[in-house]
Amino acid sequence: MTMTDPIADMLTRIRNANVVKHETVDVPASNMKKELARILLEEGFIRGYDVIEDGKQGIIRIQLKYGQEGERVITGLKKISKPGMRVYAANHEIPKVLNGLGISVISTSKGILTDKQARKENVGGEVICYVW
């Protein structure tokens, strides 16, 4: 069975594992998912990720991050652009998440960027998701 929205599946797996406080979560690999994991790592939302080659598609193993007392670092993940309704933002319309406390992930002509990076590069694109 094919998956209609693999990015939404990745976000849901992370959200579910985060709620039950798993240390790691495995998602099927793709280039876009690797870039999304890289951004989550750079922004400090996860501890790390590894790409595991299994002879097929590959797996991304994401190490989730928690605070000193076990509180979740990722409090929310929301998919914005969906297969049935794509959401695009020009460089001057890029949304801020929780007034700058979260990030929006944007697919641009210069690759997958955060909202801050896209504003700095002066590019717009498809708003993939919000993370806070």
Curated annotation (Swiss-Prot):
PROSITE patterns in alphabetical order: RIBOSOMAL_S8 (PS00053)
A GO-annotated cellular component: ribonucleoprotein complex
Record InterPro entries: Ribosomal_uS8, Ribosomal_uS8_CS, Ribosomal_uS8_sf
Single GO MF annotation: structural constituent of ribosome
GO-annotated biological processes: translation
Pfam families xrefs: Ribosomal_S8
Keywords, ordered alphabetically: Ribonucleoprotein, Ribosomal protein, RNA-binding, rRNA-binding
Complex formation: Part of the 30S ribosomal subunit. Contacts proteins S5 and S12.
PANTHER family, A to Z: 40S RIBOSOMAL PROTEIN S15A
Main function: One of the primary rRNA binding proteins, it binds directly to 16S rRNA central domain where it helps coordinate assembly of the platform of the 30S subunit.
Family: Belongs to the universal ribosomal protein uS8 family.
NCBIfam families assigned to the protein according to its UniProt record, in alphabetical order: PRK00136.1
Protein name (database record): Small ribosomal subunit protein uS8
Organism of derivation: Clostridioides difficile (strain 630) (Peptoclostridium difficile)
Gene this protein is translated from: rpsH
